[in-house]
Structures are given as C-alpha cells and as structure tokens.
Amino acid sequence: MIFTRSAKSTALALVATVGLFAQVQTAQANTETLTVAGGCFWCVESDFESVDGVKDAISGFAGGKVANPTYKQVVRGGTGHYEAVQIIFDPDIVSRDDILSKFFRSVDPTDAGGQFCDRGQSYATAIFAESPDQKAAAEKAKAQAASDLGQKVVTPILGSFPFYAADASHQDYYKGSKIVLTRFGPKKQSNAYKAYRDACGRDQRVEKLWGTAAPFVGH
C-alpha cells in the first residue's frame, strides 16, 4: 500500500493519539481515591502530598447535605460537612493500608470535638469508605490505632458521600507565594501556613500522642 506524505502524517498522528490515550487510561486505572477528614484540610493536603505514590491531594468538603458549600458555610456550622481531603494514590507504590496508617498517626483520633485548636464538627476526623474493601481496611486500621494507643479511637468510618472541592484559594495553600493578611500580620502564604500550623499545636499534640510513629511531625 502506498501512502502520500499527508496520509502518513495522519496515520502517525492517529497512532500517537491512541498511544497517549492508552497511557492516560492505564494511569487512571492504577490509582485509588481515599477521602479522609483530619481537621484543617491544608495540613492534611500538605502531609499526604509528601508521600511517595500519592498523585494528588485535594482539599474540600464531604459528609453533609448542602450541595456545593462554601468554606464560610462549612466552618460556620450547620451543613454537616467535614473539611476533607481526597487522596489519589498509586497502590502499586503506596498501599491503602499504609495511607490509612499514616492518616491515623497524623491526627488525634481520640478527639471527637475537632482537631487541635480548631473546634467543631467540621474539623473532626472521619474516613469516607467508597467500597466494602475500603471500609474493612479502615476498620482494621482504626482497631490497630486503638490498640497502639491503648485508648478509644472515635474516628467514624462513614459511607461514600459526594465530595465538593474547595475553591482554588484553598488548594496547595501550604506552598502558596502570594501575600495574605493573618493575625500574625502580612505574610507569604506558605509562611502563614507554617505559622498557623505551629500556633495550632498540631505537630506538638500528634508527637505527644504517637511519638516516633507520627509520620509528618515537623513537616
């Protein structure tokens, strides 16, 4: 069969497109999503984006009945939503069990009233299981956390809920470069995040509770 130059170019472009599509499909097939609530979503996002095998962590809201809630609505209370983070990871690199273990050891799962300086239901911990396998894994991780602590773990294992991503100003907050006004004065966003995290006592409490098992202290 004889191809003209134009036909050859078209054929090569088609092959490249099909190959790229196959790569994208494979990449998507090799990921799993786990949704957790661990207090301030900036902190949870920052922690898990440092884990090898985590493709992305997205700050948002889950667990409530209000569709497309705003940040102010959620923190004011009454929506039923938690500040939550969707962790998208490659299970060939980091396992679901490892993600769950790190989650429990990065929060205070004995506190039902919020997390650290942030109080109220929207800041409490939770895991949103999207499948029976995720639920079983979460229950196992919860039991192990309770055993390791020798204390009751109050983090609920909930079912699947719609997840609403927070607006762009809350995504990757921990590494933002713009200047923001804080109670500490004007600060570069990444520095404002560090000041907030330190003042809130997150790492101090987690280290006291979990000791050397805490994976993100000082992060």
Residue ranges and their predicted role:
Residues 2-13:
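Bacterial N-terminal signal peptides that target proteins for export
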Residues 2-3, 25-219:
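Flexible coil/turn and secondary-structure edge motifs
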Residues 12-15, 31-32:
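Exposed boundary/loop context
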Residues 18-26:
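C-terminal segment of classical bacterial N-terminal signal peptides
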